[in-house]
């Protein structure tokens, strides 16, 4: 109907689509933003990146997209601040990297959790800082009291009491999922984090196609018909062979003498003097170079034939 807007289906949250969005954002950030003309584009791009990452994250942890985050009641009462600590089981799993699992590459996993739950998620306590020397220097200083505690995740939220309790409960459930170690090779969240890190570094490649050159060659092979050809014979290079003898051979002269010595009836002319029969009389001299001495001689059909039926000279001679 007229006036209705056509709603297009949103692209599926795939790693390739996320990589395209990341590349677009990187390209847009490199362009000069005169008078804020890209503000709306940047906002839409950030929203799409957030949607794709959210769907991929939910598919990874829950198996399907969770829609409960938008189901919040209306605010009732004043703003309240709630918080809860979840201690990391580092004593039970001393070799497991819980901090990297919670934060993700460049903090993307923690930011995704914050966007979904509406809570502030921070890693605190011993071992929460990457720089161990800096952690020891800050221990005991003001605002660094948490370094004296065991490693934990601090979840805080500010909202009305009824809404804050729902948000905090959801955040605690999501963080508890991250505190359960997965077997090596079966950690889907870790695979997603490594994929995101490769996208950010520009080193992500599709696992189905190893390289663009290989994909192009496979497509060309599938479309082009296959032609079976026989083996190519090994022959000497024709360009290196002398196209014609460098000097006239004795064959035309012998044929001319033999023809003139015969009568019309086929009998020898009485006045004709035939060449004496010597061992050298049957030799035809072909002056080829030594490397081509074993090559077959040029066929006599390559020489011109005059009107009398006698083979002509290979090269014209001066009369």
Curated annotation (Swiss-Prot):
InterPro entries given in the database record: BBP-like (IPR045071), KH_1_KHDC4/BBP-like (IPR055256), KH_dom (IPR004087), KH_dom_type_1_sf (IPR036612), STAR_dimer (IPR032377)
Span of the annotated motif SH3-binding: 276-279
One Gene Ontology term of the molecular function aspect: mRNA 3'-UTR binding
Residue span, KH domain: 87-153
Main location: cytoplasm
Pfam families (alphabetical): KH-I_KHDC4-BBP, STAR_dimer
One cellular-component annotation, GO: nucleus
Coiled-coil boundaries: none
Complexes and interactors: Homodimer; does not require RNA to homodimerize.
Summary of the function given for this chain in its UniProt record: RNA reader protein, which recognizes and binds specific RNAs, thereby regulating RNA metabolic processes, such as pre-mRNA splicing, circular RNA (circRNA) formation, mRNA export, mRNA stability and/or translation. Involved in various cellular processes, such as mRNA storage into stress granules, apoptosis, interferon response, glial cell fate and development. Binds to the 5'-NACUAAY-N(1,20)-UAAY-3' RNA core sequence. Acts as a mRNA modification reader that specifically recognizes and binds mRNA transcripts modified by internal N(7)-methylguanine (m7G).
Protein name in UniProt: Protein quaking-B
Organism (species): Danio rerio (Zebrafish)
Gene name in the database record: qki2
